[in-house]
């Protein structure tokens, strides 16, 4: 599972997911991509599940780039705990995704193979996504 090696602070505020993604919304590395259409927190487990699904479906050949990284810790308090006594301990890591963000990119395979592999990865995501492709490469 993906997680940062070292962080400045152990806990973070939840924050808001306002507006569209201003960075990471263009295809940069591959020819095909999976683009988010809704805002969400995507966990490191979901990212890994999508990556595995794409790798299995692309079979041999093809290169995959994961364009998001889970750098936000999510804390959870133990069950049946009274209020107070500080914030809970970090349990898992999430990536904050806004609409327009590219989640995965792929190259080295045909369009229909990429569409099938990315479609299976999309079903692992908790949000609506779309398959996009670059005309340039």
Curated annotation (Swiss-Prot):
GO molecular function: rRNA binding; structural constituent of ribosome
PROSITE patterns the UniProt entry points to: RIBOSOMAL_L16_1, RIBOSOMAL_L16_2
One cellular component (GO) term of this entry: plastid
Region (Disordered): 1-21
Keyword Signal part of the UniProt annotation: no
Basic residues bias spans: 1-17
Keyword Transmembrane helix: no
Keywords: Plastid, Ribonucleoprotein, Ribosomal protein
InterPro entries in alphabetical order: Ribosomal_uL16, Ribosomal_uL16_bact-type, Ribosomal_uL16_CS, Ribosomal_uL16_dom, Ribosomal_uL16_sf
Disulfide bonds: none
Protein localization: Plastid
Main location: plastid
UniProt-listed GO biological process terms: mitochondrial translation
Coiled coil: none
Family: Belongs to the universal ribosomal protein uL16 family.
Subunit structure: Part of the 50S ribosomal subunit.
Name of the molecule in the record: Large ribosomal subunit protein uL16c
Lineage: Eukaryota, Viridiplantae, Streptophyta, Embryophyta, Tracheophyta
Gene that this sequence comes from: rpl16
């Amino acid at each position: 599972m993906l997680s940062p090696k070292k962080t400045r602070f152990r806990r973070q505020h939840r924050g808001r997911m306002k507006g569209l993604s201003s960075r990471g919304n263009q295809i940069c590395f591959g020819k095909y991509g999976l683009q988010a259409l809704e805002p969400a927190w995507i966990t490191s487990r979901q990212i890994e599940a999508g990556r595995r699904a794409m790798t299995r479906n692309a079979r041999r050949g093809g290169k995959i780039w994961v364009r998001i990284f889970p750098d936000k810790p999510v804390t959870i308090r133990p069950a049946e705990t009274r209020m107070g006594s500080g914030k809970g301990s970090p349990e898992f890591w999430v990536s904050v995704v806004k609409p327009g963000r590219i989640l995965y990119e792929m190259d080295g395979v045909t369009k229909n193979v990429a569409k099938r592999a990315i479609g299976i990865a999309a079903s692992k995501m908790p949000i609506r996504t779309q398959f996009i492709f670059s005309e340039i490469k």
